[in-house]
Design a protein with these regions (language model features):
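Glycine- and acidic residue-enriched flexible segments with recurrent GG/GxG motifs
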Residues: 1-205
Length: 205
């Protein structure tokens, strides 16, 4: 369940602004910063690997399996959403060995069937945005973290998956499985509406 607490804002230098006044939001992604529980991880996930945007040692690192060839670096979770509803999906992502990342949906039969958008984690810029996503944003925080967000609208199929992926370049989905391809992630969120509100930690249902 979501933790109910006042939303706190920080600037790029991680200095406290104060309590935010913003719409109430529910984070629909359970275990939203514990990517080892209920998430499909491709590769090796190390929990509590790095300092997260909130200053705690709670950010995760995902690195490829080292199996050779090409494949994915991914944390993906199954979701059940409402039909014909607009959602904002967001996550905090930081470059590690990989300097690109993308957020994607899949397994929906209509609406955002398989749709992705890419960001450059070195320059803080938006790359390719596929049909199904809108209002894509990347906001720089302290210590090279970015909050990345985008908006989707569901169709009649409400069951699908949302994933955070590492990438080697814009508009590419596969990485070299050499044991070094990695990104840092924290604070995934899915909420109704058109705005990424302050991150709400979640745990069990």
């Amino acid at each position: 369940a979501a933790v109910i607490a006042p939303a706190i804002s920080y600037d790029r230098a991680n200095s406290l602004y104060g309590i935010l006044s913003e719409p109430a939001a529910t984070n629909l992604l359970l275990y939203s910063r514990d990517f080892s529980t209920g998430w499909q991880d491709s590769g090796t996930l190390t929990a509590n690997y790095a300092v997260a945007p909130d200053g705690t040692q709670s950010a995760a690192r995902i690195v490829d399996s080292g199996a050779g060839g090409t494949g994915y670096v991914i944390a993906r979770r199954a979701v059940t959403l409402a039909a014909s509803t607009t959602y904002t999906i967001s996550a905090y992502i930081k470059q590690d060995q990989l300097t690109y990342a993308y957020i994607g949906t899949d397994s929906f039969t209509d609406g955002p069937i398989t749709a992705r958008f890419w960001v450059n984690l070195a320059s803080g810029t938006i790359g390719t945005v596929q049909t199904g996503w809108s209002n894509v944003s990347i906001v720089g925080l302290s210590d090279d973290w970015y909050r990345v967000s985008g908006q989707i609208t569901t169709g009649s199929d409400t069951a699908g998956r949302i994933g955070i992926f590492g990438a080697e370049a814009d508009n590419t989905v596969l990485v070299n499985l050499d044991g070094t391809s990695s990104i840092l992630i924290w604070g995934a969120q899915a909420e109704t509406g058109t705005v990424a509100t302050s991150y709400v930690p979640t745990y069990a249902a």
